[in-house]
Amino acid sequence: MTWFRKPPAPATAGDLLFRAIETWQGEAPWGRVLDAGTGEHSLGWLVGRPTRAWTAVTGDPTRQQSLRTAFSTRMRPVDRVVDGDWADPGLLRGEVFDVVLADYLLGALDGFAPYFQDRLLSRLRPHVAGRLYLVGLEPYADPAPDEAGAIIVELARLRDAAILLAGDRCYREYPHTWVLRQLRQAGFQVVNTEVVPIVYSRRFIDGQLDVARRKLPRFRDPGVAAAMGQAIEALRGRAHAVHDRLGGLRVGADYVIEARPVGG
């Protein structure tokens, strides 16, 4: 089964999220780090940190191999990319890390372990010796409050329709207020939070619609696939026009949270 993960926010937003983590970490040693839901974006940032060792987990064997290849020259003998499912109690059993990063992991989890989201933070808790940094996306407001929001919601609906018609699962994002409650229930103390507004670019628009287009060959009905292809390009034109007129699509926000184990 394949899945879709939201592409990284525009560089300025992504930089701000990771910059917040770097600021909160300060002079504290990074030590052993776990990237609990890895990808090129998070791992590309992580390999630039002064870690003693890192472990990166992905639920996709294909991605595991591609990441090993992409980062082969930057991996030390102590670094590893692991294929695993957090619903598996044996995954990294007994291992503890100084820092754990969960970069958009909650949103992506539905593709690997549906209905496990409310247990994820408790599952990660035994692996966190020092700090947990969690990055997420606020769910889009629906109905949207303005024109930019309406375009983003329409993009998300069309993309998700294509994903479902291809037989795959969509991601599901959770608001930071829900995450804060779950962290406290899982035995964490929330230390810092930051919310970063998003300005979506043409690149984001095209990325979302290209995800939908790549699903078309797997539609069972060629007629539905053809109609979806036309809808994709029609929406691309309208979204580009709104983007250009507004100077970007200012919609929603990403958030980053620092938490530490209670009593840790």
Where are these regions (language model features)?
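Conserved S-adenosyl-L-methionine
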Residues: 188-199
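A short, conserved alpha-helix within the catalytic core of class I
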Residues: 108-127, 134-136
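Conserved class I S-adenosyl-L-methionine
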Residues: 131-159
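C-terminal helical/coil "lid" or tail adjacent to the Rossmann-like core of SAM-dependent
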Residues: 197-245
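A short acidic, Gly/Pro-enriched loop at the edge of an enzyme's catalytic core
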Residues: 90-100
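Short alpha-helix
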Residues: 169-187
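Class I SAM-dependent methyltransferase SAM/SAH-binding core
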Residues: 32-92
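Class I SAM-dependent methyltransferase Rossmann-like catalytic core
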Residues: 1-30
